[in-house]
Amino acid sequence: MEDRRESELKTFCSKNILVILGFSSIIAVIALLALGLTQNKPLPENVKFGIVLDAGSSHTSLYIYKWPAEKENDTGVVSQVEECKLKGPGISEFAKKLGEIDIYLEACMERARTVVPKSQHAETPVYLGATAGMRLLRMKNENLASKILSTVAESITRYPFDFQGARIITGQEEGAYGWITINYLLDKFIQKSGWFNLKPRKGDTQETYGALDLGGASTQITFVPQNQVLESPENTLHFRLYGKNYSVYTHSFLCYGKDQALLQKLTKDLKNTNGTIHEPCFHSGYQRRMNVSHLYEAPCTRRFLTSLPFPELEIQGTGDFQKCQQSIRPLFNTSYCPYSRCSFDGVFLPLPQGDFAAFSAFYYVMGFLNLTSEEGSFQSKVTSTLEAFCSRPWAELQMYFGDVKEKYLSEYCFSGTYILTLLLSGYHFTAETWKNIHFMGKVQSTSVGWTLGYMLNLTNMIPSEEPSSTRLSHSTYVFLMVLFSLILVIVVIIGLFVCHRPSYFWKDMV
């Protein structure tokens, strides 16, 4: 009788335990299958390409981007595969030689034809955006600017790509697209979250970076002010990206790119000379001759227009950083401000907050001066470096930097001093907030600038709402796979143990 009760108890317990174990094993198997299927989808073979030409004031560059077709709405999936710099000046310089535009574009367009697979030529969009150089030409001669763009368009349409047009983008667009680019590359638009990282790591906040862009003819500042009233609607843009709203301040200062700023300074200094300028922003021993008419033909220098008795200007460098900075400061008119805060020329500027990425000429000039590393995060180091560099004789520089073009080498003293003065006197950074400026050329092998943001916007690859599901991080995925595998193994071991446990085990359970 007792043996029968023991047998019935064993059978009852075994069935219940096995049911529980079976249910647990099914859940573990389903979890493993679900993780495997969602996380290890085969990589899409269909890669898409996009081409953007940046027609700047001093040169034109072509960028080729690629991305997996099935991940267009993910963040950080677009990568740069090629950068090709066209030989020659910016397209605005072709006003009197339109017939040379075909040759100008040929090398880089042929390079694009080689890089992009032939089977995808017809579906690869090509965009050309012209910036401040063409904005200035349009101010001077709108018909001529239109002719250049139409000639460029005719040339590009001869290639087997999906040409989407050539246009002059506004300064506001240039600033906004640069801001989108840097924050897309730094992965700042999507809040990182998962089962085991619900709280961001210390220092891993999701605040966006501000963008500082400097070209030859204009400069842009763009950022999201925190807890500040945006007093100037024309400088405010509203974006909804990945389910989050952004109120972005942006302004483009036409004529305040480094090349046009130099022309402004030289034209201003001409008033009190007899045709010779002793220029502290050029190195001692350096000489340059310029046609006076060239100085006054640009819209940026018209405010200094005056009648001069000499046709040619002679520049003689003196190499003095302090005097150079003193002569640059008057370019920024801070005497008038109709708002609570201004940058210069009466333009509203909120208090710069948070980290900023400084790219384009900001990066190239500071890179030449070896100020893009941690040392460059101290304003005092930047000042002392420029002071030492500007004082070096021209002959010495030519000997040490013989491979650098004379135009660029001769202007690094001015350009570096101008950048320092623009950031301090124009944008009102301080010695304390200078450390928040990060000079960047590339992020993850992709050039920082407005072109990527431009393409992302035109191809609608940044959704307004956050994707409903994203892949787990690699560490989370591995952890879950190991966890559910262990659960499955433990369930099997317990099941085997239950089925083969000696009879006294069941007696102990009574």
From Swiss-Prot:
Key words of the record: ATP-binding, Calcium, Disulfide bond, Glycoprotein, Hydrolase, Magnesium, Membrane, Nucleotide-binding, Transmembrane, Transmembrane helix
S-S bonds: 84-108, 255-300, 281-324, 337-342, 390-413
Regulation: The ATP diphosphohydrolase activity is decreased by half by sodium azide.
Subcellular location, principal: membrane
UniProt-annotated location(s): Membrane; Membrane, Caveola
Active site positions: 174 (proton acceptor)
Record: glycosylation sites: 73, 245, 274, 291, 333, 370, 457
Keyword Mitochondrion set for record: no
Database matches in SUPFAM superfamilies: LDH C-terminal domain-like
Catalysed conversion reaction: a ribonucleoside 5'-triphosphate + 2 H2O = a ribonucleoside 5'-phosphate + 2 phosphate + 2 H(+); a ribonucleoside 5'-triphosphate + H2O = a ribonucleoside 5'-diphosphate + phosphate + H(+); a ribonucleoside 5'-diphosphate + H2O = a ribonucleoside 5'-phosphate + phosphate + H(+); ATP + 2 H2O = AMP + 2 phosphate + 2 H(+)
Spans within the Extracellular topological domain: 38-477
UniProt PTM: N-glycosylated. Cleaved into two polypeptides that seem to stay together by non-covalent interactions.
Gene Ontology molecular function: ADP phosphatase activity; apyrase activity; ATP binding; ATP hydrolysis activity; CDP phosphatase activity; CTPase activity; GDP phosphatase activity; GTPase activity
GO terms classed as biological process: nucleoside diphosphate catabolic process; platelet aggregation
Enzyme class of the recorded protein, top EC level: hydrolase
EC number: 3.6.1.5
Tissue-by-tissue expression: Highest expression found in vascular endothelium, smooth muscle, spleen and lung (at protein level). High expression also found in stomach, duodenum, kidney, lymph node and aorta (at protein level).
Official protein name in the record: Ectonucleoside triphosphate diphosphohydrolase 1
Record note on quaternary structure: Homodimer; disulfide-linked.
Residue intervals passing through the bilayer: 17-37, 478-498
Bilayer disposition of the protein: Multi-pass membrane protein
Cofactor: Ca(2+); Mg(2+)
Protein family: Belongs to the GDA1/CD39 NTPase family.
Taxonomic source organism: Sus scrofa (Pig)
